């Protein structure tokens, strides 16, 4: 899986309430959630995102309440990948289950600035900053996680597996 897009940096300890505030949890429609992605920090944030852009986060991204709406909102905003210093564990699992790729890179995240053009090869874990030339390597995903992502998330993966039984 390859991705190319503009970086949208967000801060540290961004919780799921900032990603998608509770007042928007009345739907699971990805487009509607995407229109309100990050509105807990800035109401018009999602309007700057183009399809294929990449979110870049600091430490402990996705902390707080466990809600599948948060990764759905990110996907609905058009961002298929979040590169981060670190992720809250429950958000990490929810993201993959919903089909959102997370790449945990530690302090290497500092090699990316807001607006940088990025290119990602998820199969190898290679992240290239096309703006600066910096290269970041993230461990490749385990085969089981890559298989879930390839089916758009856990529901698609399970449906396919059940069809084979």
From Swiss-Prot:
Its EC number is 4.2.1.33. GO terms for biological process: L-leucine biosynthetic process. Gene3D superfamilies: Aconitase, domain 4 (3.20.19.10). SUPFAM superfamilies: LeuD/IlvD-like (SSF52016). NCBIfam families: LEUD_arch (TIGR02087). Heterodimer of LeuC and LeuD. This is 3-isopropylmalate dehydratase small subunit. It comes from Desulfovibrio desulfuricans (strain ATCC 27774 / DSM 6949 / MB).
């Amino acid at each position: 899986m390859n991705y190319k897009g503009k970086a949208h940096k967000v801060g540290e300890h961004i919780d799921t309430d900032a990603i998608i505030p509770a007042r928007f949890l009345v739907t699971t429609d990805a487009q509607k959630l995407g229109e309100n992605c990050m509105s807990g920090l800035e109401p018009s944030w999602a309007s700057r995102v183009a399809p294929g852009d990449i979110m870049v986060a600091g430490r402990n991204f996705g902390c707080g309440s466990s809600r599948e709406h948060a990764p759905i909102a990110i996907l609905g905003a058009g961002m298929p990948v979040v590169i981060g210093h670190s992720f809250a564990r429950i958000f990490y699992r929810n993201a993959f289950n919903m089909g959102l790729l997370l790449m945990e890179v530690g302090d290497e995240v500092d090699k990316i600035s807001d607006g940088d053009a990025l290119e990602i090869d998820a199969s190898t874990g290679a992240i290239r900053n096309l703006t600066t030339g910096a290269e970041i390597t993230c461990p490749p995903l385990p085969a089981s996680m890559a298989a879930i992502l390839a089916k758009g998330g856990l529901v698609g993966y399970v449906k396919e597996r059940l069809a084979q039984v």
